[in-house]
Amino acid sequence: MRKFLREKSSYIILICILLIQIIFMIFYCDMKKGYFVDEVWSYGLANSYYHAQIWEDGALDNPEISPEIFKDYLTVNKGETFKFGSVIYNQTHDSHPPLFYMVLHAISSCFPGQFSKWFGLIPNLLYYAITIVFLYKISRLIKKDKYFAFFPILFFGFSIAAVNMVTYIRMYMLLTMWCTIFAYEHLSIMATRKIKKRNLISILIATFGGLFTHYYFVIFAFPMVLVQMIWMIMRKDYKMTGMYVLSGAIGGAGAVVCYPTILKNLTGTGV
């Protein structure tokens, strides 16, 4: 009972810290003024209907450029809502996988003809919150001190790096979330010396999500997978190794099936 109360109190503290951090981030999101060019492309590639670049078809060649050209590029028009095929098409003319853009398009589709920074910032706040939770779980695995586990989330959660990732309307906060989940599941397997169904499902989802978000995920995941494989083979746990490989392979293959352009971009033969 005492252990249960201690655990409960630690999660209450975690929730309180997370709420404060979200309020902290909302403050910076509210102050956001202006957009870096890549953020403009985020909206354009997500919402422009089968029209990846605004200068295509000579749209900017006229001496007088109508504001409607930019509005059409950055917002979802009526009749073009939830057209994820358009998002995927646009990304085949860009250099990133489509998940981030699909989420941005889905939210923008709920508000046709409207543009708001919050369409991109609210998802980032959600990714940030999930990242904080898994960072806390990682800290608990590394050191079994529930109070020590608060220091990493305080250090990262209020850092300028976190502020930049949340307020920058690109895919990097989403990528960080997938990497944190991926890392936690690997550390969990090593800590418990067994692989659970939950671990397999999470690794599958994180692999799919990470590869479907940014190719940097491969750079992050490869050394972790290599170490995990060596560790399992040295323990001669071939059943665990097989399940682990299958889980990651399904996640990776699923991303490629959903977006075959991944292979071209990873091999340098794409855009």
Language-model-derived ranges and their functions:
Residues 23-41, 58-61, 257-271:
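Helix-to-loop transition at the C-terminal end of transmembrane segments
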Residues 106, 134-137, 154-158, 162, ...:
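Specific aromatic-rich, kink-prone transmembrane helix
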